[in-house]
Swiss-Prot record:
Source organism: Rickettsia prowazekii (strain Madrid E)
Gene3D superfamilies with a match to the protein in the record: 3.40.50.2300
UniProt-listed CDD domains: PBP1_ABC_unchar_transporter (cd06325)
Disulfide bridge partners, by residue number: none
Top-level division of the source organism's lineage: Bacteria
Name used for this protein in its record: Uncharacterized protein RP367
InterPro entries attached to this UniProt entry: ABC_transpt-TYRBP-like, Peripla_BP_I
Length: 303
């Protein structure tokens, strides 16, 4: 009887200790790195938060404010702190994070990354080629592409140049180094241009107000590559709903935090594309018609 009581007390003690450990255990920490202030970033972060809401996790959101020096400072801070998982948003931020942090799992969101030989890295790709959109608007014969010097966009710039050459489209291009260059760049676009084109180019989309005002003056559309740009005034874009990118990345992060190795979670492509339309901006241009948009093979979302 005495021994039985001892065992009872011992197991009761173990049970209390286990419960106390579970209750007092520190939550996992996830660092989300956003490249700049933009509606699309807020939506992606919101999706990440939604996907992780039912597990004990602390989400730290760090904003690089489109500054490479701030980005490096954030990455170095994360590298030296008790962070369990990192979610960088965008190709440039993801590449920089991967090159500096080699001992923590990384889930890249809205990025094009070659995951070969990167066992701690996985992610979500949401890219759609701008040529896929332009090809469905064959009446556009004179277009202007505004882009930054970011290495990420150069392949798509070259792809658009080749597409324009092969399809007898007059393509005017203007590369800018910073937002101070943008007003002159858009003013210098040919008078006969039928549309401004922008990519998923963080510097350019942060200056969308400059672009849309010039587009309104010319009565031409501003064709973008993401939902957030349309919310902020671009006429149309074909892309994915930004929040869903975050949800997909968050679900990957959840699996990793629950014990699945990143190398066992393949990179995924977002395939459910949507045509985003800003109705106010649409009414301020004379090139695209409702009929043009109605034949595009995507579900529509209007703002």
């Amino acid at each position: 009887m005495f021994i039985s009581n001892i065992f009872q007390k011992f197991f009761s003690f173990l049970f209390v200790l286990l419960i106390t450990t579970l209750v007092c255990a520190d939550p996992k920490k996830v660092a989300v790195i956003v490249p700049l202030e933009h509606d699309s970033m807020y939506k992606i972060v919101s999706g990440i938060q939604e996907a992780l809401k039912d597990i004990d996790v602390e989400i730290l959101v760090k904003n690089a404010h489109a500054d490479p020096n701030i980005l490096l400072a954030i990455i170095n801070q994360i590298k030296d702190h008790d962070i369990d998982l990192i979610i960088p948003i965008g190709t440039t931020v993801s590449q920089t994070t991967i090159s500096h942090i080699i001992n923590k799992p990384i889930v890249c969101a809205a990025a094009i990354i070659n995951g070969k030989n990167l066992p701690l890295v996985t992610g979500v790709n949401d890219e759609i080629k701008i040529t896929d959109t332009i090809s469905k608007l064959p009446f556009l014969e004179n277009i202007t592409l505004i882009y930054s010097s970011s290495e990420k966009v150069i392949p798509e710039v070259e792809m658009l140049k080749l597409y324009a050459k092969n399809n007898n489209i007059s393509l005017y291009t203007a590369m800018i180094q910073n937002l101070n260059d943008m007003p002159i760049a858009v003013k210098n676009a040919p008078k006969n241009t039928q549309s401004f084109i922008i990519l998923k180019d963080h510097l350019i989309v942060s200056g969308i107000n400059i672009l849309k005002q010039e587009a309104f003056v010319r009565r031409i559309p501003l064709i973008a590559s993401d939902e957030g740009s349309v919310i902020n005034g671009a006429t149309i874009a074909v892309g994915v709903q930004e929040k869903q990118i975050g949800v997909e990345a968050g679900l990957m992060a959840k699996k990793i935090l629950q014990g699945i190795a990143p190398k066992d979670i393949p990179f995924s492509d977002m395939k459910d594309f949507t045509l985003f339309i800003n109705l106010k901006s649409f009414l301020k241009q004379d090139i695209l018609t409702q009929e043009n948009l109605s034949v595009l093979p995507f579900k529509h979302k209007e703002f």
